[in-house]
Amino acid sequence: MGLVIVVIMFFVICFFINRNTDKELAERKKEEKNNYKKQGLYLVDDYYVKLYTGFREYGIKENVRLILFKDRIIFEIDYKVKKTILFKDIEDYRIQTESQLIERASLMKVACFGVLGLGMKGKEKEVNREYVYIKAVYEGEVANIIFERGIGENEKIIQELHRLIKEYKNMDISNNVITE
């Protein structure tokens, strides 16, 4: 009987701790939204992703925060470095499988090395894991950014990004100031 009471108490305590944590998280999110609003930025959503490529000084990075705004994307790396890409600088965005990315790399080999590029070995296996691919101009150079969040989540990010970019393009830019 005493064990049952201890187990029930444990679950009650866990329930209240979880409830308080959710409230604190919501309050922090609201406060962050207000702080960005003061800077003229309108936070829409954020995700934690695994970044594979896109920025020269970084290799594969876990727990990169992808922050979506109404006019830009910010990649927050190591909780301090922020890489900002304005929607006007995004040339292409889509979900691609690993096979499609490998094919794209093979085409780059041909472009760089001509016919000799065809002889270079690459991965031969067929893999259909999905990634988010964004081609954008970052600091004057074309950046091919590849990241993933997980099955189903990649599509959610692309849909949200598509909606935001569409709204951005339909916006009357002459009445809005877009900050860098």
Predicted regions and their residues:
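Beta-strand residues in well-ordered beta-sheet regions across diverse protein folds
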Residues: 69, 76-77, 135, 146
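Anionic N-terminal interaction surfaces
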Residues: 2-72
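Acidic, Ser/Thr- and proline-rich intrinsically disordered linker/docking segments
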Residues: 93-180
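Short, surface-exposed charged micro-motifs
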Residues: 63-65, 82, 92
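Phosphoinositide-dependent membrane-docking surfaces
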Residues: 73, 84-101
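Glycine-centered tight beta-turn/hairpin loop motif at sheet-sheet or coil-to-beta transitions
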Residues: 61, 78-80, 137-142
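Short, surface-exposed coil-to-beta transition loops
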Residues: 61-63, 80, 127-132
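Short, solvent-exposed coil/turn segments at beta-strand boundaries
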Residues: 65-74, 88, 139-140
